[in-house]
Design a protein with these regions (language model features):
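Bacterial signal peptide processing site
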Residues: 25-27
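Short, solvent-exposed secondary-structure boundary motifs
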Residues: 1, 65-73, 136-152
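C-terminal motif of bacterial Sec signal peptides marking the signal peptidase cleavage site
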Residues: 20-23
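Bacterial N-terminal signal peptides that target proteins for export
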Residues: 2-13
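Extracellularly exposed regions in secreted/surface proteins, prominently low-complexity, repeat-rich
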Residues: 140-176
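Mature extracytoplasmic domains of secretory-pathway proteins
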Residues: 72-136
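Hydrophobic alpha-helical membrane-embedded or membrane-associated segments
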Residues: 14-18
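Extracytoplasmic low-complexity, Pro/Thr/Ser/Ala/Gly-rich segments
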Residues: 30-94
Length: 176
């Protein structure tokens, strides 16, 4: 009887240890909200709150490539988060903005760059890294982005991580 008890006890300990390890590793996969819980995502002067529910409306803001109205994301992009550009707003009186973090395939990103910027998406890998001293990235932590590349067009800054896969579309606005 004592031997069965010891075997059962060891099984319980192993199961609990595995459960703890699983819980710890899964916690790393859970994404952190783009804005702190309880913080308003509405910026003064901004046309929409900075959240996933208003993504379609946010993408209609400003001028996109070739002067057309609104913005777009790479084909098939998955939006990870939508956050307010609070640092830009603090530095620019009356300014507001949105930071849209997304993931997309390498091919979709290259096609997007060719279609929406003055650059050929084939050659992104050979371009110099984005300047961390630039005031265009105050709402994104460049230190967490490997080999960043950027392009600006109209009211937007496109920031990409190389190798390609992650990107940020930074839309800015201000009273005119």
């Amino acid at each position: 009887m004592c031997r069965r008890f010891l075997v059962a006890w060891r099984v319980v300990v192993v199961v609990l240890a595995c459960a703890c390890l699983t819980a710890c590793s899964l916690s790393r996969l859970v994404s952190v909200p783009a804005t702190p819980v309880g913080t308003s995502t509405v910026q003064e002067g901004a046309p929409y709150p900075a959240d996933m529910e208003h993504l379609d409306q946010i993408l209609t803001v400003g001028r996109g490539p070739n002067g057309r109205k609104g913005q777009e994301l790479p084909e098939g992009a998955q939006v990870v988060s939508v956050a307010p550009a609070l640092n830009f707003a603090a530095d620019f009186p009356g300014g507001w903005g949105y930071v849209i973090a997304f993931t997309a395939t390498e091919e979709a990103i290259r096609d997007y760059v060719t279609r929406n910027t003055g650059f050929n998406g084939k050659y992104i890998d050979n371009s110099p890294a984005a300047n961390p001293e630039s005031n265009r990235f105050e709402d994104v932590d460049l230190s967490a982005i490997q080999n960043p590349w950027s392009a600006g067009f109209w009211d937007v800054v496109l920031l990409l991580e190389r190798p390609l896969g992650r990107g940020w579309l930074i839309i800015r606005g201000a009273p005119r």
